[in-house]
Curated annotation (Swiss-Prot):
GO BP: any one term: translation
Protein name: Large ribosomal subunit protein uL29
Signal peptide location: none
Swiss-Prot/TrEMBL keywords: Ribonucleoprotein, Ribosomal protein
Native organism: Buchnera aphidicola subsp. Baizongia pistaciae (strain Bp)
Domain of life of the source: Bacteria
Family statement drawn from the similarity comment of this UniProt entry: Belongs to the universal ribosomal protein uL29 family.
Recorded GO CC terms: cytosolic large ribosomal subunit
């Protein structure tokens, strides 16, 4: 996901996106631990997306204060 796309979203949408990413990370971690994950790089992508969403979310919350 591009940063421009993330910045256009509202705080509510960002929270929903964050929950979806965390759920996806959990599922990928389970698959990885069971040795069923063929594309282990997906974990890194999801982790990066979580960090980006958290950063933008913090910026938007700071703006509201």
């Amino acid at each position: 996901m591009k940063k421009v796309e993330i910045k256009k979203k509202t705080i509510k949408e960002l929270n929903i996106e964050l929950m979806n990413l965390l759920r996806e990370q959990f599922n990928l971690t389970l698959q990885h631990s069971a040795k069923k994950l063929q594309q282990s790089h997906l974990l890194q992508h999801v982790r990066r997306n979580i960090a980006q969403v958290n950063t933008i979310l913090a910026e938007k919350e700071k703006e509201c204060d």
